[in-house]
């Protein structure tokens, strides 16, 4: 995805497998415009993440960093049908009005990280809920599971950190096993959650990073590292990224979907 809401596909090698000196653009779709046409209203969030599912459909999510619910920005989750992508790659015309499908989010809800694909569908974590979505001549919401968040976290006057968290909600992309969806919430303390892939039911919940010294907060901003030994044991590693976020993310005039270090990251954190 690009910062102007397009998704591009580039050809990197020739038919013999040699790397091209200059990549060739073979697909360019304005996803935000296509999603607005499908939704019938304007989106006030920008394109954040894309991923292919197991059937070749291209899923997308709008959002950014620190999607504040009270600002009521309009966002969507959705996909472009595999058939349309194949048509474009074959040099044919594709009618996106019949190939782009969206799931309208409540104003103020949006994605803050990546999308995970499984054989069951696309798993997307917004600032308020975790979804399993499936392409079925439209977006089928198989399940939607809410989770806790205390909201955006920033350093206090006596804290031993600067900056804050990058997300308002859970902040991490979902990690998958064949049976589970795993991510952290943004409660206090932060908890690692495991959801049943089929039902979305929370089957395990455990506080993590809850033994830090006073003056340190927790914000998980990347996927949990997950290892499934296929014998009934799943192991995880969760990392604390608190302090990475720029204090400027709290500014209502900041467009948190703009991917730039100056807008997103705390410079003190980058230099340590």
Per-segment meaning from a language model:
Residues 6-46, 51-272:
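Extracytoplasmic/lumenal domain signature
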